């Protein structure tokens, strides 16, 4: 994220305090003592942390919720610690369904670097409350089995641990749960204890599905240090129709542009349902309560214009990928829907658009539209392709073509080797000349 975007971000000063804003935005599902936490956030400048385990090469939309909570707390004057789990990532937190595959130390170390780079883009590392990055391998990697059992494990009761929601589900499943994953909650509790000792950290934030792990830390600090510390669990974002948020055709929406292009990312947000878009604006943008209220009115009165979805898609894509790639993405989207010029797109953006379309490679001596339509599957035969062309039902790069012998000329090729072929209103495909 650019410095300009970071500098433009601010909390809504119409709220009494940051706690009230977090609650209004729907970012608090569960917490430790609410009254004490609100008072601490209002009266003190807390050091807080959020942990991210390197179980993949990129963060995804679920992590974006946590990153934005961190940024909102930082804007309120609190001190952020971004923890990447080079230690806990060697195990991975228990999943609801089955045991994780253990990744090699080399892969985990590589992913740690990748996640650190991503997290750093969402926080400010300048000023009085500059963010800091930490890696729990720094203390966990030095811990012997004896020290772990004597100094940490002694404070955990198995009866309490097995009641944690995910552990209980796994224990009742056919596969069960290994001691490795069962012990994960102890390791996360250790993180909070170490950060409390080293940095005076008194607040941890995370997803509500991690609540058992969060409270492992608060309880460990209470037993070992005799201190009361805080935790916030954010809700798991769900769609109004019951489908899982953060997935597109079953695939996670990653924050890394190499794993999910800015174009695909933008389209994901643009397709948000009317019933969900206001909640998404609250969680994923820095728009004020008044601004979001205006979009709520537009959804109620002019939903067909989809202005709220367009603003949401712009804000979140710019937040994650930057303003320039977002503007290129919007230009690409408009071109695909016949409202823009493909020739105005840079090659990188054009390629990301083509990745979303059916595509074929054709040699320079086969650039006739009959071949293009049949190879793309837009015509079942050459005779059908001729009929489509005769009726003017095809276009190249948004320009309608007609005539059975129509060719894609070298002048029409985008960046010297690409073309977008359309049949009718819905069928579009990409041609690459080889």
Language-model features: where?
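Generic alpha-helical propensity signal that fires on short helical segments
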Residues: 40, 64-68, 96-100, 149-151, ...
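Conserved nucleotide- and phosphate/pyrophosphate-binding catalytic cores
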Residues: 223-434
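Short acidic loop-to-helix transition motifs that present clustered carboxylates
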Residues: 188, 213, 401
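Predominant activation on well-ordered alpha-helical scaffold segments within soluble catalytic domains
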Residues: 116, 184-187, 193-196, 215-218, ...
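NTP-dependent nucleotidyl-transfer catalytic core
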Residues: 1-210, 218, 225-230, 243
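Short alpha-helical patches at coil-to-helix transitions and adjacent helical residues
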Residues: 63-67, 142, 213-214, 310, ...
């Amino acid at each position: 994220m650019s410095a300009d975007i970071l500098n433009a971000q601010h909390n809504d000063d119409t709220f009494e305090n940051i706690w009230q804003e977090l609650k209004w935005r729907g970012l608090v599902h569960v917490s430790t003592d609410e009254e004490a936490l609100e008072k601490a956030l209002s009266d003190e400048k807390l050091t807080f942390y959020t942990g991210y385990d390197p179980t993949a090469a990129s963060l995804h939309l679920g992590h974006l919720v946590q990153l934005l909570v961190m940024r909102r707390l930082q804007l309120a004057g609190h001190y952020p610690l971004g923890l990447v789990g080079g230690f806990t990532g060697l195990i991975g937190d228990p999943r609801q369904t089955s045991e994780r595959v253990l990744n090699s130390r080399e892969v985990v170390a590589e992913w740690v670097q990748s996640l650190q780079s991503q997290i750093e883009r969402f926080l400010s590392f300048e000023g009085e409350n500059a963010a800091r990055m930490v890696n729990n391998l720094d203390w966990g990697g030095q811990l012997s089995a004896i020290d772990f059992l004597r100094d940490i494990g002694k404070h955990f009761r198995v009866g309490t641990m097995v009641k944690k929601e995910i552990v209980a589900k796994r224990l009742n499943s056919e596969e069960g749960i290994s001691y490795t994953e069962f012990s994960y909650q102890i390791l996360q509790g250790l993180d909070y204890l170490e950060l409390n000792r080293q940095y005076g950290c008194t607040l941890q934030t995370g997803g509500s599905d991690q609540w058992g792990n969060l409270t492992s830390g608060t309880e460990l600090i209470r037993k070992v240090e005799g201190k009361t510390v805080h935790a916030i669990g954010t809700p798991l974002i769900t769609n109004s129709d019951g489908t899982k948020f953060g997935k597109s055709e079953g695939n996670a929406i990653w924050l890394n542009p190499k794993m999910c292009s800015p174009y695909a990312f933008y389209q994901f947000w643009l397709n948000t349902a009317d019933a969900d878009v206001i909640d998404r604006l609250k969680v994923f943008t820095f728009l004020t309560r008044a601004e979001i209220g205006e979009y709520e009115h537009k959804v109620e009165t002019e939903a067909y214009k989809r202005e709220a979805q367009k603003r949401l898609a712009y804000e979140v894509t710019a937040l994650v990928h930057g303003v320039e790639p977002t503007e290129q993405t919007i230009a690409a989207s408009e071109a695909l829907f016949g409202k823009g010029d493909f020739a105005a797109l840079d090659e990188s953006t054009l390629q990301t658009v083509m990745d979303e379309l059916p595509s074929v490679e054709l040699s320079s001596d086969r650039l006739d539209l009959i071949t293009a339509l049949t190879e793309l599957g837009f015509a079942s035969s050459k005779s059908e392709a001729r009929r489509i062309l005769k009726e003017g039902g095809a276009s190249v790069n948004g320009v309608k073509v007609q005539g059975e012998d129509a060719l894609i000329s070298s002048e029409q090729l985008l960046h010297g080797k690409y073309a977008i072929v359309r049949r009718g209103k819905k069928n579009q495909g990409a041609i690459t000349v080889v």
